[in-house]
Swiss-Prot record:
Alpha-D-glucose 1-phosphate binds at Y101, G166, E181, K182, S192. GO terms for molecular function: ATP binding; glucose-1-phosphate adenylyltransferase activity. This is Glucose-1-phosphate adenylyltransferase. Involved in the biosynthesis of ADP-glucose, a building block required for the elongation reactions to produce glycogen. Catalyzes the reaction between ATP and alpha-D-glucose 1-phosphate (G1P) to produce pyrophosphate and ADP-Glc. The gene is glgC.
Amino acid sequence: MAQKQKCVAMLLAGGKGSRLSALTKNLAKPAVPFGGKYRIIDFTLSNCANSGIETVGILTQYQPLELHNYIGIGNAWDLDRVSGGVTVLPPYAESSGVKWYTGTASAIYQNLNYLSQYEPEYVLILSGDHIYKMDYSKMLDYHIEKESDVSISVIEVPWDEASRFGIMNTNEEMEIVEFEEKPQFPRSNLASMGIYIFNWSILKEYLEMDARNPESSNDFGKDVLPLLLDEGKKLMAYPFEGYWKDVGTVKSLWEANMDLLRDETSLNLNDRNWRIYSVNPNEPPQYIAEKAKVEESLINEGCVIEGDVKHSVLFQGVTVEEGSMVIDSVVMPGAKIGKNVVIERAIVGSEMVIEDGTIIRPEKNVDDVVLIAEGK
């Protein structure tokens, strides 16, 4: 019998991330590189570790191999525990065949046995594909104080973007009175961050109810949360005011990387009180040639810079040869940039080779971002 836990986290990491195009052709979205030396999933796992959440189930599905290898037993995040720790939970086969996760609620439902062994009071449900730093223990305290059945973390988004999110309409006490999934005409700009705390008994009851409904799409936002509201359960919105970015598109991923280069940013990766942990490869120090120029950039281990790099993020093992310029760009691990190349407002994928004399920049709209990548 597993040791009883007050709160167990379930991290949804099976997303395909189709809007990231070639970056996720052979890679799960949470495993996409970010910020010079991280993967997207590092932020959620580090938040768990820093918040004192010691038991984390990671639900994987799409292209899971590299993600599984990266997570390992969770030691990079101090989550390799005798009791609890990290457990990877892919779909599994029953006598009737393999049961794929058909939605966010389906994924948790198929792992109720995993949760039951810990007899938790609360279950924290997370997404593995957002960039943010958050103390989940404060949200749990809020949930308990408000005597809520479900608490949902929300953040104010620009009104012109509200129709892209699940929107919470609340009363003055922040109790949720209506949930609208991507409304055409939103009445609030409080967007769901995809972070939920459920009382365990409520979660179990309503997931079992949802699984019995043949018309359900087995999704929290579309099915489970509206049902809870219809039945009068208490749902509270937990306001979050820090940095949060949904990096589901090429442009938003680029923007989040560029945010790291700003003088004033709430996403401080050097915060000693809230470290973001990662699995770092062993690479030699970066080499910057005498004639090279580097300005306002993150240059990581193993890079060889002989050209000019300005306001860019370069991952480990990147080469920029003589005469080349990299401006306002993200260059992922192992990419080789030849001589006299110009790269501007672009993301260059892992292990890409950019031939001598190539020019890469937006052709039509100067606000666009170019993606140069291919599946492995």
